[in-house]
Amino acid sequence: MKPSFFSSIVIVILCTLILSSCEQALFAPTPGADNASVFDSMWENVRNKYTFFTFKRIDWNALRTKYRNRAIDARNDEELFTVLAAMLNELQDDHTNLKSHFDISRAQPFFNDSANFDIGIVRRFYARKQELITGSLVNFIIERNGKKYGFIRYDSFLSPIDTIAWNTVLRRFRRENVEGMIFDIRNNGGGALANAVFLASRLAKRRSEALLEMTKNGPGENDYNTPKKLIITPDTSAAEQQYRFIDKRVAVLTNRNSYSAASFFPAILKSPEFDHVRLIGDHTGGGSGLPMDAQLPNAWTYRFSGTKSFIPAGLISREQALAAAPRANHDADWSIGYNFEWGVPVDIKIDMNLADRSRDAIIERAVEYLATGR
């Protein structure tokens, strides 16, 4: 993903096949790629372009001391890969990976957090086999006390949301005269920001200057470009009004496994143009930096965050910031806004009791909000 809100990830992998055997080609050494030059190439590039050292209180120079000799002493590709992956994982950033022909490293910084999601419970006790699969949107109706609530499950922002599918679901909800809508993006690992922008444009009451993005443009700690704005512009034409859900309450369900684009979408919803929307569940997993790609002298590729994004100043309190990201240095960019790299704070925090196999406490709390506004 290039460092821009509306651009796509472009990964270029250069492979040079040598000899006639596929196995020989895959495992052939790269001439001149000694361990020291491979390590130094990665360390220096990340030093110059990574965006969250200050926010995460990371001493990159100290990590060079910690890992460089280990890399030099690595006896084979697997050992070198392990050292480089361990250093990248110190960034605590799930947009950071090292890729070789035999493995891909993963950080998973919130892997041990409560899942707060069980798709089996949703299917058995809420969908009850009456869900429709409309494009990438699984949708059904929840009934409580004579009232109906529309429910949408969106598994991945990698799955395109087209206008026809969205409009079809909205027409169904209008026919059923739902009191509000639940939009579930728990355990959504992200994908295309264009899908987040599409959804936000259908929920925005008016034009919104939703987020700010900064891109690293030099090796210095403060070498960034002027913040760019992400603008959400809804279609306000009369023909599109029935497909904008702005007249009733919306609950967006999140957990720590809502990452990347599944954090950008909730971050957008913090703007005042979405005052009918509440985030319910657990804080998101974050991922506010868009990844940039690079290649090492031995032909391995890697990626790391080359931008940082913010909810504009004044929309997130210090208390909320610390609740979502207690280990972060929020003073680093507080005058610009809240950096949601380690999570977007929810409006209503609630955890599931996974011992209760017939109830989703987060869905139940969402229904309460839709019914009462509280």
Describe each model-derived feature in a short phrase.
Residues 8, 167-169, 236, 334:
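Residue-level detector of functional hotspots within protein domains
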Residues 17-21:
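C-terminal motif of bacterial Sec signal peptides marking the signal peptidase cleavage site
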Residues 4, 125-126, 279-281:
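Intrinsically disordered, low-complexity segments enriched in polar/charged residues with Gly/Pro
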Residues 22-233:
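Flexible, low-complexity junctional segments that flank or bridge functional domains
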Residues 25-40, 190-374:
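C-terminal "post-core" interaction segments
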Residues 1-9:
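Bacterial N-terminal signal peptides that target proteins for export
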